[in-house]
């Protein structure tokens, strides 16, 4: 699970959506958290605990959303030619 603290909303937006967003790290985290949830037969995957300007928020998804999130990660890996991660994601999709 990703744990991050941001001093401002701008810093938060830049991390997730900015030009230099760490998208591979974000998708790796999503895949890993869903993998854990599937392995432990959990209904929820917890992606992140974030603090933005002192306000805490949790980011998670429920089992019906696992496939969509994994497909988004798979598309990201394909578009960015990170093929070595595709098989693991497809294996997780097949488990659902």
List PLM regions with ranges.
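Short, compact, well-ordered microdomains
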Residues: 63-96
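Long, acidic/serine-threonine-rich intrinsically disordered regions with weak helical/coil propensity
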Residues: 1-15
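Alpha-helical structural elements
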Residues: 7, 11, 22, 41-42, ...
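Short, charge-rich, low-complexity alpha-helical interaction segments
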Residues: 13-62
């Amino acid at each position: 699970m990703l744990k991050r603290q941001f001093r401002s909303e701008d810093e938060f937006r830049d991390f997730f959506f900015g030009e230099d967003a760490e998208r591979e790290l974000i998708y790796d985290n999503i895949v890993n958290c869903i993998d854990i949830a599937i392995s432990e037969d959990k209904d929820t995957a917890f992606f992140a605990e974030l603090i933005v300007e002192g306000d805490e928020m949790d980011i998670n998804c429920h089992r019906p959303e696992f496939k969509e999130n994994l497909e988004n990660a798979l598309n990201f890996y394909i578009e960015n030619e990170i093929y070595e991660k595709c098989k693991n994601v497809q294996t997780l999709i097949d488990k659902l």
